[in-house]
Design a protein with these regions (language model features):
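Transmembrane-helix boundary motif in ABC transporter permease subunits
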Residues: 78-108
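Non-cytoplasmic
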Residues: 190-240
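C-terminal transmembrane helix and the adjacent membrane-cytosol boundary/short C-terminal tail
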Residues: 98, 189, 233-263
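Short cytoplasmic-facing helical segments at TM-TM junctions of multi-pass membrane proteins
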Residues: 151-187, 219
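Transmembrane alpha-helical segments of polytopic membrane transport and secretion proteins
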Residues: 1-27, 247-263
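Transmembrane alpha-helices
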Residues: 135, 139, 172-204, 233
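Generic hydrophobic transmembrane alpha-helix motif, especially the helices
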Residues: 109-144, 151-152
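Periplasmic/extracellular loop-to-transmembrane helix junction in inner-membrane transport proteins
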Residues: 38-81
Length: 263
């Protein structure tokens, strides 16, 4: 008991220590940014942190800020969730059918190797610009989810599966108690990787397609009018939204898996 308490305290102390170091690291790079801005003395080249924060607060309290955030958030997250669902389905299907895996392989290879800009320009011909970010986000996430889930299923411990077969454990219980826990690390890893990708690709699609009322439109206008503080402020907004959504989504997934395994 005493040993457990000491370990918990040590972990807490380490967590506090590293949290402090992370904060100092952020402050260090903000200071470098400020000094670089002061040295250049041209906001058009590098806006200072102070002007960016000021602009950020102006945006937050402006009328159409939340509309733009909502517009992009709904579409990019929709693309991500659709890719997750289809990626899991295709991975399970490919695991049970080699023919399906062979059929899917060329498509996954093409999507992986084709530049995002090429897809965006091609898709502008077929898809309205307001829905372009949905499809591009979906396209960038699908191969990552599919590949990781398929690999996770393949790496499931064969001895455990043989034991389940010997004791005649039905497929539903195998999925619940064996496959879910074995595949979860691969799924979480895929989500961490693809969440950043989907936001970068989705916003890039909006910058090129320029749908009205999107974050991409705001970035495009900031570039056209050489409004560097605006550009930095919207970039920070994208980073924060992406970070918060990632933490929330992964937390929900972990909670759902825990409930499934311990129900």
């Amino acid at each position: 008991m005493m040993h457990s308490i000491i370990n918990d305290r040590a972990k807490t102390d380490n967590g506090t220590k590293y949290a402090g170091i992370r904060i100092l690291a952020v402050l260090f790079w903000i200071a470098i940014w400020q000094f670089a801005s002061m040295y250049l003395k041209q906001e058009i080249l590098l806006a200072s942190p102070v002007s960016v924060v000021r602009k950020l607060f102006e945006l937050i309290f402006s009328g159409n800020f939340w509309q733009s955030v909502g517009f992009s958030f709904v579409r990019i997250v929709t693309g991500f969730l659709l890719a997750v669902l289809l990626g899991i389905f295709l991975a399970v299907w490919a695991y049970w059918s080699k023919t399906v895996e062979i059929l899917i392989a060329p498509v996954i290879a093409v999507v992986k190797s084709t530049p995002v800009a090429s897809f965006i320009i091609l898709c502008l011909i077929w898809i309205p610009s307001k829905n372009l970010s949905v499809f591009i986000s979906f396209l960038m996430v699908l191969p990552v989810i599919y590949t990781n889930i398929l690999e996770g299923i393949r790496q499931t411990d064969r001895k455990i599966l043989e034991m389940a077969k010997v004791f005649r454990v039905n497929l539903r219980r195998q999925i619940r108690y064996i496959y879910v826990s074995q595949v979860l690390p691969y799924f979480l890893s895929a989500c961490r990787l693809s969440l950043g990708m989907c936001w970068k690709a989705g916003v890039a699609a909006e910058v090129i397609g320029v749908p009205s009322g999107s974050i991409g439109e705001k970035l495009y206008n900031a570039k056209i009018y050489l409004n560097t503080p605006d550009l930095f402020a919207w970039t920070i907004v994208i980073i924060v939204i992406s970070f918060v959504f990632e933490k929330c989504f992964l937390g929900i997934v972990s909670r759902v898996v825990y409930m499934i395994e311990h129900r």
